[in-house]
Amino acid sequence: KDINTIDLGAGNGKNELLNLTLQDVLDMGKKDGSGNINLTILGDSQDKVSFKDEIGKTWEKQANSVTENNKTFDVYTNSDSTVQVKVEDKISDGITS
């Protein structure tokens, strides 16, 4: 709980974070002063992250990526507008149903 960054590591082999649900992110994420959860996942091309859709709680990959600290991130949102997850673009990422 109270996590805002997960570092899967770079150059340390294949690490996977699979089937993340909205509840998983709500349970582990740290809320900011506005009550929003902004989770950042770092890693490299050997790593994999997937989000799991549930009834009424679907993930969406945003069309535009964002750049912070010279790193580019894919941005995922869910039906809960207070949640945003940024996944470093080198990581293999996607949504499962």
Regions found by a protein language model. Give the residues of each.
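Extracellular beta-sheet-rich ligand-binding/adhesion modules
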Residues: 1, 9-29
